């Protein structure tokens, strides 16, 4: 009887997981530090802003964990931010990694932070290659954001360079996202 209950619970958990879509590697799983503080982020946001970290690229989970820890250390220790700046990050391994996560305001696009989620690709996409699994992960994450009510269904997608004087998100990402359905020029 206990095994049947356990099996039923496992099926329900898996069904819930599948309904939410893309798997997000938690901050604890990649060895991130807890935030010093958080600011709540509203629901049904109007914007998603795409970035690149302009740093090291990673191809494996272990490499991505190390890069994430480095980005977080730079943001917290050098810039004095309470946490890594982005809500989510995507590695060359195709995984989505938790940054500030859902419902916490990021520090990725100045005055746009209260109205947007920030998604960053690990690497410098002026020369690093954007792989199909990374594109798929980003699109699934955006769909999840709409399904969970974090983004409005009519959200607008911008590259960071559209809201700030920067090369971010790099030429390769810039060329890719301009073909996505929610992108606005």
UniProtKB/Swiss-Prot annotation:
<dbReference type="Pfam" id="PF01510">
    <property type="entry name" value="Amidase_2"/>
</dbReference>
<keyword id="KW-0964">Secreted</keyword>
<feature type="binding site">
    <location>
        <position position="160"/>
    </location>
    <ligand>
        <name>Zn(2+)</name>
    </ligand>
</feature>
<dbReference type="GO" id="GO:0005576">
    <property type="term" value="C:extracellular region"/>
</dbReference>
<keyword id="KW-0399">Innate immunity</keyword>
<dbReference type="GO" id="GO:0042834">
    <property type="term" value="F:peptidoglycan binding"/>
</dbReference>
<dbReference type="GO" id="GO:0008270">
    <property type="term" value="F:zinc ion binding"/>
</dbReference>
<dbReference type="InterPro" id="IPR036505">
    <property type="entry name" value="Amidase/PGRP_sf"/>
</dbReference>
<keyword id="KW-0391">Immunity</keyword>
<keyword id="KW-0479">Metal-binding</keyword>
<dbReference type="InterPro" id="IPR017331">
    <property type="entry name" value="Peptidoglycan_recognition"/>
</dbReference>
<keyword id="KW-0862">Zinc</keyword>
<keyword id="KW-1015">Disulfide bond</keyword>
<comment type="function">
    <text>N-acetylmuramyl-L-alanine amidase involved in innate immunity by degrading bacterial peptidoglycans (PGN). Plays a scavenger role by digesting biologically active PGN into biologically inactive fragments. Has no direct bacteriolytic activity.</text>
</comment>
<keyword id="KW-0732">Signal</keyword>
<dbReference type="GO" id="GO:0008745">
    <property type="term" value="F:N-acetylmuramoyl-L-alanine amidase activity"/>
</dbReference>
<feature type="binding site">
    <location>
        <position position="51"/>
    </location>
    <ligand>
        <name>Zn(2+)</name>
    </ligand>
</feature>
<dbReference type="InterPro" id="IPR002502">
    <property type="entry name" value="Amidase_domain"/>
</dbReference>
<feature type="site" description="Important for catalytic activity; essential for amidase activity and zinc hydrate coordination">
    <location>
        <position position="86"/>
    </location>
</feature>
<feature type="binding site">
    <location>
        <position position="168"/>
    </location>
    <ligand>
        <name>Zn(2+)</name>
    </ligand>
</feature>
<dbReference type="InterPro" id="IPR015510">
    <property type="entry name" value="PGRP"/>
</dbReference>
<feature type="signal peptide">
    <location>
        <begin position="1"/>
        <end position="21"/>
    </location>
</feature>
<dbReference type="GO" id="GO:0009253">
    <property type="term" value="P:peptidoglycan catabolic process"/>
</dbReference>
<dbReference type="InterPro" id="IPR006619">
    <property type="entry name" value="PGRP_domain_met/bac"/>
</dbReference>
<keyword id="KW-0378">Hydrolase</keyword>
<feature type="disulfide bond">
    <location>
        <begin position="58"/>
        <end position="64"/>
    </location>
</feature>
<dbReference type="GO" id="GO:0045087">
    <property type="term" value="P:innate immune response"/>
</dbReference>
<comment type="similarity">
    <text>Belongs to the N-acetylmuramoyl-L-alanine amidase 2 family.</text>
</comment>
<feature type="domain" description="N-acetylmuramoyl-L-alanine amidase">
    <location>
        <begin position="46"/>
        <end position="170"/>
    </location>
</feature>
<protein>
    <recommendedName>
        <fullName>Peptidoglycan-recognition protein SC1a/b</fullName>
        <ecNumber>3.5.1.28</ecNumber>
    </recommendedName>
</protein>
């Amino acid at each position: 009887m206990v095994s049947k209950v356990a099996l039923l619970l496992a099926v329900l958990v898996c069904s819930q997981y599948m309904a939410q879509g893309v798997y997000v590697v938690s901050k604890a799983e990649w060895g991130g530090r807890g935030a010093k503080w958080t600011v709540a982020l509203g629901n049904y946001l109007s914007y998603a802003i795409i970035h690149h970290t302009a740093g090291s690229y990673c191809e494996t989970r272990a490499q991505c964990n190390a890069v994430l820890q480095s980005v977080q250390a730079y943001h917290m220790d050098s810039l004095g931010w309470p946490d890594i700046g982005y809500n989510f990050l995507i590695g060359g391994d195709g995984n989505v990694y938790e940054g500030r996560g859902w419902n916490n305001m990021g520090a990725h696009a100045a005055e746009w932070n209260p109205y947007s989620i920030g998604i960053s690709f690990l690497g410098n996409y002026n020369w690093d290659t954007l792989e199909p699994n990374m594109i798929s992960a980003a699109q699934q994450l955006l769909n999840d954001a709409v399904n969970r009510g974090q983004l409005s269904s009519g959200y607008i997608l911008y590259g960071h360079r559209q809201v700030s004087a920067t090369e971010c998100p790099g030429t390769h990402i810039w060329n890719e996202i301009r073909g996505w359905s929610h992108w606005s020029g």
